[in-house]
Amino acid sequence: MILEKAREILEEHQLCNHCLGRLFGKLGKGTNEERGRAIRLLLSMETGKEYKEPEKCELCGGVFNNLDKFAELCIKAAEGIEFETFWVGSRFPEEIEKKEEEIWRKFRVVSGEKITKEFNRELGKVIAVRYGKTPVKERPDVVFIVEPFSEKVELQVNPIYVAGRYRKLIRGIPQTPAPGFKESIATIICRAFKKHFHGKCIFKGAGREDVDVRMLGNGRPFVVEIKRPRKRKVNLKDIEEEINQSGKVEVLNLRFITPEEAERILTTRHRKVYEAIVYVKDGITKEEVEKVVKSLKNAEIKQRTPRRVLNSRADLVRVRKVYDVKGELIDDKHFKLRLVTDGGLYIKELISGDRGRTTPSVSEILGKEAWCEILDVLEVLDDVEGDN
């Protein structure tokens, strides 16, 4: 039945061995070219008629004879780009794909393989053998999109994702570039990444601290995306050392990650440990500090979006929890608070009350005006909110 169908097709169409074999591509093993050559030979033996391969195939135009040339075009397109893994895609003229489908319909072909699939696979084999690169479908370093009939190659360079944590050692630096500031956490970190990877750097932090707040302890999680990197073989320890020489920011635990891991890091809320120096206008006693500690421990805080961020945040009431509190009297107007809270709780407003928008607050508990003079984030805890 296969030979009869092949004979009928060859009576009407001038097909090369690749395109003939591809009509039966889902049957048996071996390449389409081998399959087509075998079918042609069997037909000749059975009928006594020679079924020679045409000089030019009416379907593919002979593109499979030029795979070495297309491989060279791909490597040339990637000149200066460091890569080890790749994948191949292709764009054939619409009329070619339609003609292939018409042959399938007319001769009731049910075991065929699309021309693009064979071309991508066979070109991938040539690139792998000639240039020592590895074809990988999931997250390759680069993707070659080949247009065989126009001999054009489009190069897609996939981004690199790196995760880590940063410590902010001094006050007065925003997390991302902002008017009135010469530098930011993002610019300090990205400067080193751009230098080593030779690509565009995008910094994203898992939450942020205010400009006047330090981030200490184990640091805040962040992700860097490097778009169109020209270098991939980079020692992340070298980047760590370079950033840490700034004296302003330190990074630790840099590691390569997947896009899915990046999404998880940036969307997971973690409990945080804060240390605040609180000023009480009308004075504070040791007993009042103990009252604050007792009132806030395990308290649920209803917090309306702080007035100072209303221009960039929706005006909503959010419920966050304070898990643990420790207090220490410093002098008659100052005391220290150490808090373990849900992520997303604004600590300055937890202290001031923000004109009643946060309740309970230190000001509300004391019945006195209080505000935060100094604030540090001591830790971003690894346990996810809600875990025991």
UniProtKB/Swiss-Prot annotation:
Residue span, THUMP domain: 35-159
UniProt keyword terms in alphabetical order: Isomerase, RNA-binding, tRNA processing
Pfam family for this entry, one: Pus10_THUMP_arc
Temperature and activity: Optimum temperature is 70 degrees Celsius.
Active site: 210 (nucleophile)
EC main group: isomerase
Family named by the database record: Belongs to the pseudouridine synthase Pus10 family.
Record protein name field: tRNA pseudouridine synthase Pus10
Organism: Pyrococcus furiosus (strain ATCC 43587 / DSM 3638 / JCM 8422 / Vc1)
